[in-house]
Design a protein with these regions (language model features):
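Extended terminal and domain-junction accessory segments
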Residues: 1-157, 199-206, 210-228
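C-terminal soluble interaction/assembly domains
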Residues: 166-204, 208, 215-222, 226-228
Length: 228
């Protein structure tokens, strides 16, 4: 697909083929407002004021223009799960709340399985739960295809990362994704939904999924998935 800009959330990657014309051109990183709460003083909220643009690279383009590029091999064509049967559908709700339990650890864990926190600290949750490494939150079948609706009920974006298996974008903010997009970090905008499909191929065992904003992850927004 042809784009003029690419939004990269924490941990995102993108492969770009740049069409250049003669001259000097800059590649810039532009800050994105990912929402926030005033009480967080910027630590868990938006980019700091004034940090709007950073020049990453400058290209000087000259020489004879290339008439055309060779086509890409079909062996690189990614799989499209929209044409395949879905084994299960799930909804994962990403939310936030003030911690209530005095001295309890993440997910009621022990001193070794969860970090004890101030009861007044913010908690970031998935389906109302904070992370507990001793709890399996999702069990999926090896070779299955699942459709997940990622629902963000908080006032800030959550870039969601699933270890091992990439996610194909199906719908974002109520709009069907027309082109074929695979990501291993999917941004879920504030107060919005994103639907993805996942093919649980090639690997079995336990791993995690979590928000890729490390503050949110550390405050509980992570879960355990087991594929078997």
């Amino acid at each position: 697909r042809t784009v003029d800009d690419v939004v990269l959330t924490p941990g995102n990657r993108a492969d770009l083929l740049v069409t250049a014309t003669a001259g000097t051109w800059a590649v810039r990183a532009v800050a994105v407002d990912r929402g926030g709460m005033g009480m967080m003083h910027g630590r868990l909220g938006s980019a700091a004021p004034g940090q709007t643009k950073t020049t990453l690279a400058t290209f000087a383009v000259n020489g004879t223009p290339t008439a055309a590029l060779d086509g890409f091999s079909q062996q690189f064509a990614p799989r499209d799960l929209r044409a395949e049967a879905v084994t299960a559908k799930r909804e994962l709700v990403f939310g936030m709340t003030m911690g209530m339990g005095g001295g309890r650890g993440m997910g009621q864990g022990t001193a070794t399985s969860g970090a004890t926190r101030d009861p007044g600290m913010m908690e970031f949750t998935i389906n109302g739960e904070v992370f507990d490494p001793d709890r399996v939150d999702i069990t999926a079948g090896s070779g299955s295809i699942e459709e997940w609706t990622l629902k963000n009920t908080s006032p800030m974006d959550h870039p969601v990362h699933l270890h091992v298996w990439p996610m194909q974008l199906i719908e974002t903010q109520g709009q069907t994704v027309q082109d074929l997009q695979w990501q291993d970090v999917v941004n879920v905008p504030a107060n919005s939904n994103v639907t993805v499909r996942i093919a649980f191929d090639n690997f079995v065992g336990k791993t995690v999924y979590h928000c890729h904003v490390l503050d949110h992850e550390d405050l509980g927004m992570m879960g355990v998935i087991e594929v078997r």
